[in-house]
Amino acid sequence: MFQGQRGWFCGSVSQDLRQFWVAEGGTISDPRAADFLFSCDASHPDTLRIYQSLDYIEDNATVFHAYYLSAVANAKIKNSVALGHFILPPACLQKEIRRKIGSFIWEQDQHFLIEKHDEVTPNEIKTLRENSELATEHKKELSKSPEKHFIRTPVVEKQMYFPLQNYPVNNMVTGYISIDAMKKFLGELHDFIPGTSGYLAYHVQNEINMSAIKNKLKRK
């Protein structure tokens, strides 16, 4: 699953999840060399250093909640878990995000929190390691592709996603409003042609006085 990928782990991430990452073919590295940055606590000093870094400020780094790995471990289809659902924003933004869209996905699934210490058993890790070794040749073929599917701020490869109830209310901020919340208009749709139907179109330059334009139009 993570063959050849490098991950950095905050001190807030459990050893079980780190072992799962390695068992699935991933390696652990420092944050500068990592393809993925994982944390379970946005207020942890390790994670705060990431948020305060130039890479993060310039949008060249993204922190993900490490329970993404737990979701992968418990999923019937490993690549069916969308990484983007687990973006971990700075603590100062989380209250406002919860107010607008509800709790984060890892907060809703109490299974993650209750079974934190037994998410991945030693036997499961052994099995995963064996499966990872069997899949090595296949992964090598994939790595020859000219496309790089994972970068510092990952662009998640195309994969099967399962629908979530009340999406995106029970997920992260998407930046898009639901179609159900949009105002509805009845009647026929017509092309807008400037100068017809009593409407005109104007190009408004920067630093222009809108009040002066309105007064000029009224005088006409």
Swiss-Prot record:
InterPro entries: TERB2. One of its GO terms (biological process) is double-strand break repair involved in meiotic recombination. One of its GO terms (cellular component) is chromosome, telomeric region. Signal peptide: none annotated. It is found in: Chromosome, Telomere; Nucleus inner membrane. Keywords: Chromosome, Membrane, Nucleus, Telomere. Its main location: nucleus. Meiosis-specific telomere-associated protein involved in meiotic telomere attachment to the nucleus inner membrane, a crucial step for homologous pairing and synapsis. Component of the MAJIN-TERB1-TERB2 complex, which promotes telomere cap exchange by mediating attachment of telomeric DNA to the inner nuclear membrane and replacement of the protective cap of telomeric chromosomes: in early meiosis, the MAJIN-TERB1-TERB2 complex associates with telomeric DNA and the shelterin/telosome complex. It is linked to Spermatogenic failure 59: An autosomal recessive male infertility disorder characterized by non-obstructive azoospermia, due to sperm maturation arrest. Belongs to the TERB2 family. Component of the MAJIN-TERB1-TERB2 complex, composed of MAJIN, TERB1 and TERB2. This is Telomere repeats-binding bouquet formation protein 2. The lineage of its organism: Eukaryota, Metazoa, Chordata, Craniata, Vertebrata.
